[in-house]
Amino acid sequence: MPKYDSHLKCSFCGKSQEQVRKLIAGPGVYICDECVELCNEILDEELFEGATQPQPQPTKVKASRSSRRDTSLKKIPKPQEIKSYLDQHVIGQQEAKKILSVAVYNHYKRLSSKLEESGDEVEIQKSNILLIGPTGCGKTLLAQTLADLLDVPFAIADATTLTEAGYVGEDVENILLRLLQVADGEVERAQRGIIYIDEIDKIARKSENPSITRDVSGEGVQQALLKMLEGTVANVPPQGGRKHPYQEYIQIDTANILFVCGGAFVGLERVVEQRIGKRAMGFVQAGEPQKREQRLVESLKALEPDDLVKFGLIPEFIGRIPMVAVLEPLDEEALIEILTEPKNALLKQYQRLLRMDGVEMVFEPDAIKTIAQEAFRRKTGARALRGIVEELMLEVMYEVPSRADIRKCVITREMVEKRSTSELLILPSSLPKPESA
């Protein structure tokens, strides 16, 4: 009879050595033959289930681009029609509008031609667009308005949040995920959309010469964007975030996606002036801000690809955004027009809101001019207008809906200067006061 030690027990089932056929010892633990058999059964069951279930596969996109037919491609607006639509929503920037109108028309005409090409015809390459201009001059609005006109998905990405693969931050493929979400998950629609990448100047490398250290949010991002801008089939994780080997991917072909990149490119004018031999901007006399802005625009109109290389963009990246449009800084007259002229002008929005309460809203010309002057001093373009007007109109929007005696409000220059509407000019109006619910 074999000798058993009654103190030795299986660490899993608790049976003693004499109750089992074999007890295997480890460093401080024991396992019996019965528990080993049970573990083997569990493993065999999982292996069997894994073999019978289909493995996760990427969502395939048909390779034949000729099948990507969209009825909207048959009705591409002409460049003059595109510019006319832009004029209704964006003030100024006439040259930039022309460049955008032609580029967008050619891009979607290129997509339309792919539906009918036989294979031996001239292939039209994609022309992405670079918008250069100060903050608040209308770069994002131009791209958004184009997408609205063409009825295509539109997504905005911030280049400053992007890093190359393997580092903390967003992968460039997450840009495509945003576009896919806007397209309600329809891959075919997303593949004809427009992506606006803002702050593209912030991913410029620090010097013209390649760095020996890794620039994961500058040159590294430019390298990561190259294939996407040119046209590739990208694997996009459906839930966003970082990729891992065992997740499913959605495949998106970027060959027909129009990329519009925008940035302020502060200091680029000095690079241009050094090349053409002009004296650096230096100091300008007080009271001449508009003259300085005009000199800045004139310098940027002489922009060449080499200037962008010296600024910090790599040549391969510049080659994939051949269309460059320089937007002008907004002067006081342009800011006044932005307040009053566009279809969705800010003052028109407030007038409509108060009209719903049966109140007529009037902004005196001097008040509008004062708002524009203050916005121009802030140097943030059209963005400053909303901040000033919302601060001014806060008390009006709070007080007027509850006042049955107010039928007409007049905003004067003094109210704008004091940032106070406590002394509203109240006049009789022909608008009926709506009954409260």
Curated annotation (Swiss-Prot):
Gene3D superfamilies: 1.10.8.60, ClpX chaperone, C4-type zinc finger domain (6.20.220.10), P-loop containing nucleotide triphosphate hydrolases (3.40.50.300). PROSITE patterns: CLPX_ZB (PS51902). GO terms for biological process: cell division; proteolysis involved in protein catabolic process. Residues 50-74 are annotated as: Disordered. The keyword Lipid metabolism does not apply. Keywords: ATP-binding, Chaperone, Metal-binding, Nucleotide-binding, Zinc. Residues 1-51 form the ClpX-type ZB domain. GO terms for cellular component: HslUV protease complex. InterPro entries: AAA+_ATPase, ATP-dep_Clp_protease_ClpX, ATPase_AAA_core, Clp_ATPase_C, Clp_protease_ATP-bd_su_ClpX, ClpX_bact, P-loop_NTPase, Znf_CppX_C4. Zn(2+) binds at residues 10, 13, 32, 35. Belongs to the ClpX chaperone family. Component of the ClpX-ClpP complex. Forms a hexameric ring that, in the presence of ATP, binds to fourteen ClpP subunits assembled into a disk-like structure with a central cavity, resembling the structure of eukaryotic proteasomes. This is ATP-dependent Clp protease ATP-binding subunit ClpX.
